[in-house]
Regions:
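Right-handed parallel beta-helix/beta-spiral solenoid domain characteristic of secreted/periplasmic
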Residues: 18-30, 39-76, 88-112
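Ser/Thr- (and often Asn-) enriched beta-sheet segments in non-cytosolic proteins
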Residues: 21, 33, 40, 47-49, ...
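Active-site-proximal, structured, solvent-exposed surfaces of multi-pass membrane proteins
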Residues: 12, 35
Length: 345
C-alpha cells in the first residue's frame, strides 16, 4: 500500500514480529513495521529519524501491541495505526514530524500528517506521550473506547488532540497548550481553525476532563456543521485560558453537559451556536474579552451555578432562528456582568 511504499524510500525498515527491547538510547535512520500481534516493542529511549517522508512506526490490523519509550521525528507521520484493537502507546515522543502553516483548517477534516494517527482502532490507550511541534499532535479517527491520558500535545500548528468519528472515549489529564495557526484570512497566530482538543463528525458520548488548555486557537472545539456535530459529550474540570477565539466552541450539538470548568482571559469564554439541550453548570468564567458565553438560537438549555466575572452571557435568535425554553438559576455575576436574552422566548 502507499504507506508501505513510502517506508521503502528510506533505509530498509526494522521489522518487529515478537517482543523486542532495543539497546538504550540508540539512533536509527529507518522506519519500523510492526509485523505481529501480542507483542511489546520497547525502544528504551532510542530515536528513529526520518527524512521528511513516510511513516516512522507503521501498524496495520494487529492486536495487543504495546509501543513504549520510542522517539520518532523527521517523518511525514510519526506513527500510523490502521485497524486493530488493544494497543498501548506509552512514554513515546512523536514531536518534530510534519508541520505546515498559513492556511485555514476550519473544515476540520483529518490532516494526513503529524505526530500519531490511529484509524479504525478499538479499546486502546495512549498515556504519557509527547507530540509537540507537528501540524497535529494526536489524531484518532473512526475509533471507539479509546483512553487518552496524561499526554502533552503542545505547539502544534493545528490541533493538539483530534477526534473524528470517535466515540465512547476518555480524554483526561492532558496538557494541551499553544496549538495555534496562521492563515491569510485572519493573520499570524489568529486561530484559523486550530484548537487544543477537537471533536467532529459524530464523536459522540466522549468524556473530556481535567485537561489543561492554554493559549490555543480554541481550547476545545466541537463542530462545526449540523452533520458533523458531536452529541452527548461531558466536558468537565478542564482549566482553559488565553484562547485566541473561544475557550469552548460547541456548535449544532445536542445534550452536551459542560460543567465545573474554569475559563480565564479567553476571547469568548464559550460559544454555542445552534446548540440545543445544553447544560452549562458550575463553571467559572473570568475576564473574557468579548462575551463570557454567546449562545445563538439557544433552545431548551440550562445555565445554573456559574460564576460570571466581567463579560456578559448573551442568548439571542439569529438569522430567523429561535431562542426559546432556556432556564437560569443560581448564577453569580461580578463586575457588571449581565445575562442578556433579548428576543428569546
Amino acid at each position: 500500500m502507499k504507506l508501505f511504499a513510502l517506508l521503502l524510500v528510506l533505509a530498509a525498515p526494522m521489522r518487529i514480529a515478537k517482543d523486542t527491547t532495543l539497546p538504550p538510547n540508540g539512533v536509527y535512520h529507518q522506519a519500523v513495521i510492526i509485523a505481529g500481534s501480542n507483542l511489546t516493542f520497547d525502544c528504551n529511549g532510542s530515536t528513529f529519524i526520518g527524512e521528511g517522508i513516510g511513516v516512522g512506526i507503521l501498524i496495520q490490523n494487529r492486536t495487543s501491541v504495546t509501543i513504549r519509550n520510542c522517539k520518532v521525528r523527521g517523518f511525514d507521520v510519526g506513527a500510523y495505526v490502521l485497524g486493530g484493537k488493544n494497543f498501548v502507546f506509552e512514554r513515546n515522543d512523536f514531536s518534530g514530524n510534519y508541520v505546515d502553516d498559513n492556511s485555514a483548517i476550519e473544515d476540520l477534516k483529518p490532516i494526513p500528517h503529524g505526530g500519531i494517527i490511529l484509524n479504525g482502532v478499538q479499546n486502546s490507550r495512549l498515556q504519557g506521550n509527547t507530540s509537540n511541534g507537528n501540524v497535529a499532535g494526536i489524531q484518532i479517527l473512526n475509533s471507539s473506547k479509546m483512553r487518552v491520558l496524561q499526554n502533552t500535545t503542545s505547539r502544534n500548528r493545528g490541533w493538539g488532540i483530534y477526534l473524528f468519528g470517535t466515540t465512547s472515549s476518555t480524554i483526561y489529564t492532558n496538557t494541551v497548550e499553544y496549538n495555534n495557526r496562521s492563515c491569510p484570512q485572519w493573520g499570524v497566530d489568529a486561530g484559523c481553525g486550530a484548537a487544543g482538543i477537537v471533536l467532529t463528525q459524530g464523536s459522540n458520548r466522549n468524556l473530556i476532563g481535567w485537561n489543561t488548555l492554554n493559549y490555543d486557537g480554541d481550547g476545545i472545539y466541537q463542530g462545526n456543521t449540523p452533520g458533523a456535530a458531536s452529541n452527548d459529550l461531558e466536558i468537565f474540570n478542564n482549566t482553559i485560558a488565553h484562547s485566541v477565539a473561544n475557550g469552548i466552541e460547541a456548535t449544532f450539538s445536542l445534550r452536551n453537559y459542560i460543567h465545573d470548568n474554569t475559563f480565564t482571559d479567553d476571547n469568548y469564554g464559550a460559544w454555542f451556536g445552534y446548540a440545543q439541550q445544553l447544560r452549562f453548570e458550575n463553571n467559572a468564567i473570568r475576564n473574557s474579552h468579548v462575551k463570557s458565553v454567546e449562545h445563538d438560537n439557544a433552545q431548551s438549555s440550562r445555565y445554573a451555578g456559574n460564576l460570571i466575572d466581567g463579560a456578559d452571557i448573551l442568548l439571542q435568535p439569529v438569522q430567523g432562528g429561535s431562542c426559546a425554553g432556556n432556564s437560569f438559576s443560581n448564577n453569580t455575576r461580578f463586575n457588571n456582568a449581565q445575562i442578556v436574552t433579548t428576543g428569546c422566548q
